[in-house]
Every structure is written in C-alpha cells, then in structure tokens.
A protein has these predicted regions:
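C-terminal ends of transmembrane helices
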Residues: 29-42, 87-98, 122-123, 263-279, ...
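Membrane-interface segments at loop-to-transmembrane junctions
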Residues: 42-46, 69-73, 96-110, 133-139, ...
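Transmembrane helix-loop junctions at the membrane interface of multipass transporters and ion channels
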Residues: 64-68, 92-93, 125-127, 145-167, ...
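Alpha-helical membrane segments and immediately flanking helix-loop junctions
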Residues: 126-174, 335, 339-352
Length: 352
C-alpha cells in the first residue's frame, strides 16, 4: 500500500517524490487528456485542451510534482512545440509575403492590436494585475506560446513565477475555444450567409488541393532539430536594449527557437544542410511538446484553481476573456469581408 501511495502521491526522495512518481503523473495526465480529447460536447471538441483540464484536476487533489521540474518540462515542451511549427511553415514563410501574404499578415496584426487594446482597457478599468490579465488574454486567444513567453519574461524580471498568470490562462482557455468557434459561425451566417454543408465542402476541396501529402522518407532527421533548438535558446537568451524600456528585451524560449527553425528550414538547403523532417516526426514532436506544456500549466494552476473559480474572481475572468476573444474576431471578420474582400475559408484561417 505504501508503494502505491508513494508512486501516486510522492515520497521523500530525488526531485521531491521520486522519478517513478513524476513519470506516472505526467504520463497519466497526458494519456487521460488525449483520450478525453477525442470526445465531442455538443459537436465541439476541445482536443489537446483536455490535457490542461486533467492537469488542473490532478493538482487540485494534490497529485502534482516538484515546481522546479514543472517549470523545466513546461519550457521544454514549449520549445519543442514552437520549433516544430517553425519547421513546418519555414519553407513557404517568406514567399507568402509576395503572394498576398502581406495583406493577410496586416489583418492578423490588426486583430492582435485590437485584442491588446481590449486587454489594456480591462486592466485599467478593473484593476486586475498585469500578470492575471496577461494570462487571461493568452487563454482567450488560445495563444500557448504567448503564455510561455510572458511567463519567462516575468521570471527574468522578478525571479518569481506568476501562478495567477497560469490560472487566468486556464480559466479563459475553454471559453476562448468556444467563443472563437461561435464567432466563426456568426461570421459565416451573418456576413457570408454560407451554410454548414457548403463550408464543409469548401474545406474538403481545400484539403484535396493542398494534398495533405506524406513525405517519402521514413527516417526522421533529428540533427537539424536539436542543433536548431540549441541555437534558438542562445538567440532567445540574448538581451536586446530598446529605447524607452528600462529592462532589456529577450526573444525568450518561444521566440528564439521559432525564428531559428523558420530560418533553418528556409535557407538550410542553400548551405547543403538537410533540414527535411518527415511530417509524422514533426507532428509527433509538436504533439509531445504541446502535451507537456499544457500538463505543466495545469499542474501549476490547479492548486488554487477551484478556489479562484468558485470563491474568487474566476467568473469575472471568464467574462473578460470572452470580450478579448469575441471583439477582435468580429472586428477582423468585418474588415476581412467588407474591406479586404476575403473569402470565408481564407478569413477564418487568418482569424485562427
């Protein structure tokens, strides 16, 4: 019986609970979250977000791991996630600016700016701490790398971890997913007057055009991945002094690896560097990364999550998150439809 308690609840030993305890907690949280992620509620699937919820549930019942290890695994998962994204988008990243991508990126910047303005307005009107409202914004727009970058910046400045940032993210994230989906439905019905069947047919045609091709090679090339991660961490740790900002700015463990992965995947072949990674290997790295990150965010936020939601300002945070989710999406949808004349599928891609 003591063995079972030690494995699940931890015991005095290496890394505050033992290696087996750590691996069991992380593995079960990810496994349960992934199983639940395959289910749909009212036709809506939360996917990998369930990993976050299961992590919160575990931490609420005291099934957690050492906080220093949580911090490490969270950052490592974030690096894997953003680096795999950079490898995927890098080859066509720069060419997209020459084929209408500049307009789409301009709309994306507009949407982000509106979200930031709404967030700043909420901060000053409600006196919510900056750390909390930053977490709410990250969850409301489902911006996982943004949360990681904000947490690292705060840690670099203060030397402390902001648990309320993770709690704000966890509270706002579910409604961020639902609000985004409902906003897309509203845009489809009101602005485009497209039926559900027509939109599904258009998406199917887009998939056929894109091909969703598999790579011919079965051997994943890990060399550029880990060299790029090392270079990205170095780049993200370089302090950059900007006028008007007292604290040097860093790209962090989200920005550095992302930039390096885009550059390596785009320009690596010119220098005879084999940067190709099979789609399956890239997807595996990305899914492991996001699963580790959300697991650790859940374990980090779960200890005070229920108390904040029930007895604290959790319901207000949900309302603020809904505003941050809906207002930028609807504003971007209006501009995209009536100013830029974008079709529905292109617009939803930008809004996502």
């Amino acid at each position: 019986m003591n063995l079972i308690n030690n494995l699940f609840e931890g015991a005095e030993g290496s890394w505050s609970g033992g290696i087996a305890h750590i691996l069991i907690i992380i593995s079960i949280v990810i496994a349960l979250g992934r199983i639940l992620g395959k289910t749909k509620i009212c036709g809506i699937s939360f996917g990998v977000t369930w990993v976050l919820f299961v992590g919160i549930l575990f931490a609420h019942h005291g099934l957690t791991i050492d906080h220093n290890l949580i911090h490490f695994l969270k950052e490592f998962g974030l690096v894997l996630f953003v680096y795999s994204i950079g490898l995927q988008v890098g080859p066509g990243f720069f060419s997209s600016f020459r084929s209408g991508g500049l307009v789409l990126n301009g709309l994306a910047v507009f949407i982000i700016a509106v979200g930031v303005l709404v967030t700043v307005g909420i901060h000053f009107l409600s006196d919510i701490p900056v750390t909390t409202v930053t977490g709410i914004m990250s969850g409301a727009v489902t911006n996982t790398p943004g949360l990681g970058a904000a947490q690292q910046t705060y840690f670099d400045i203060t030397g402390n971890t902001a648990n309320d940032m993770a709690q704000g993210y966890a509270v706002a994230y579910p409604l961020g997913v639902i609000g985004c989906i409902l906003s897309f439905i509203l845009i489809r019905i009101v602005l485009y007057r497209v039926s559900g069947a027509e939109s599904r047919s258009a998406v199917h045609n887009e998939r056929k055009t894109a091909g969703e091709l598999r790579g011919n090679s079965d051997q994943p090339n890990l060399i550029p991945i880990f060299i790029g991660i090392a270079l990205g961490c170095i780049l993200g740790s370089i302090p950059i002094s900007l006028p008007g900002i007292p604290q040097p700015v860093k790209l962090g463990l989200a920005g550095g690896p992302l930039i390096v992965s885009i550059l390596i995947s785009r320009f690596g072949p010119r220098f005879h560097i084999i940067t190709y990674t099979t789609p399956s290997a890239n997807l595996m790295i990305r899914e492991i990364g996001i699963s580790l990150f959300l697991t650790c965010v859940g374990l980090e936020a779960g200890e005070g999550f229920v108390d904040t939601l029930v007895h604290g300002d959790g319901m207000k945070w949900i309302m603020y998150g809904a505003l941050i989710t809906v207002i930028p999406v609807l504003a971007g949808g209006f501009i995209g439809k009536y100013v830029l004349r974008l079709d529905y599928n292109t617009l939803t891609g930008v809004l996502s």
